[in-house]
Regions:
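Intrinsically disordered, low-structural-confidence terminal and linker regions
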Residues: 1-19
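Generic structural marker for isolated residues within well-ordered, non-membrane alpha-helices
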Residues: 12, 37, 87
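Non-catalytic nucleic-acid-binding interfaces of large nucleic-acid enzymes and RNP effectors
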Residues: 29
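Flexible, glycine-rich loop/tail regions that form catalytic "lids" or insertion modules at the edges
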Residues: 34-70, 81-84, 96, 107, ...
Length: 145
């Protein structure tokens, strides 16, 4: 099946230019600056939901990772507004969405390391997972107050 490109490079370039962002069609990695995140959030957060800038920035990086790492899974073609709306939708579900996702991904990485009997990777992912769980626990405790 021939799958069309629903969001064209020209459209992404147009939006980036209008938003005064670098051309996101040329992104080689998922890094997003605080200024870029602020610009995107100001466009998509029309209801002025209280979103910490770092949470939004981190979400953009996670969502952009799909396209920068896996070309065949680039849902948004790195379109800043469409990507930002995906982040906003997840944060509306739960503000700790991306911390929960990080824990789940690290649990998967740890499982693969254990399965391969690579003890260096096991130790590395165990440390990362412990840190991610601690951060999530802090967020949950703060939200429970």
């Amino acid at each position: 099946m021939n799958i069309p490109q629903y969001i064209t490079n020209d459209e992404v370039k147009r939006v980036c230019k209008e938003m005064k962002l670098k051309d996101w069609t040329k992104k080689k990695d998922a890094k997003v600056t605080a200024d870029e995140a602020r610009a995107v959030m100001s466009v998509v957060n029309t209801e002025k939901m209280a979103i910490p800038l770092e949470a939004f920035r981190r979400g953009l990086e996670v969502e952009l990772e799909h396209g920068t790492r896996f070309n065949d899974a680039n849902v948004t073609n790195n379109h800043p507004v469409v990507t930002g709306r995906i982040v906003l939708a997840h944060l509306k579900e739960t503000m700790d969405y991306y911390q929960r996702l990080e824990v789940a991904e690290l649990e998967g990485d740890l499982f693969k390391a254990v399965k391969s009997a690579d003890m260096q990777k096991v130790a590395k992912y165990f440390r990362k997972l412990s840190k991610a769980k601690l951060e999530l626990n802090r967020l949950e405790a703060k939200a429970a107050k």
